[in-house]
């Protein structure tokens, strides 16, 4: 699976990228079809971080989720939890 991890007006460190790849890999394993690529975008809105994730599946379906939190890792974890449901 190809990953595209970026930030709008914020730096995305290597540790966060590794965390995203690891956790997102676990989340998408629940789908029966093979995911082809994932796009994760982080941004900051006022006093909180926003994480938007989009995963394209080989069947043509797309799974998306969006979450807000005061910490960037918590924003991603909440986003991944929404995608898992």
Outline where the language-model segments fall.
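N-terminal, polar/charged subdomain of small-to-medium soluble alpha/beta proteins
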Residues: 1-85
């Amino acid at each position: 699976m190809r990953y595209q991890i970026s930030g709008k007006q914020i730096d995305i460190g290597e540790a966060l990228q590794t965390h995203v790849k690891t956790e997102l890999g676990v989340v998408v394993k629940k789908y029966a079809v093979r995911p082809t690529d994932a796009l994760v975008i982080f941004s900051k809105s006022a006093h909180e971080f926003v994480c938007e994730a989009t995963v394209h599946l080989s069947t043509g379906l797309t799974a998306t989720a969006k979450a807000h939190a005061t910490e960037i890792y918590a924003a991603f974890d909440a986003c991944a939890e929404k995608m898992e449901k």
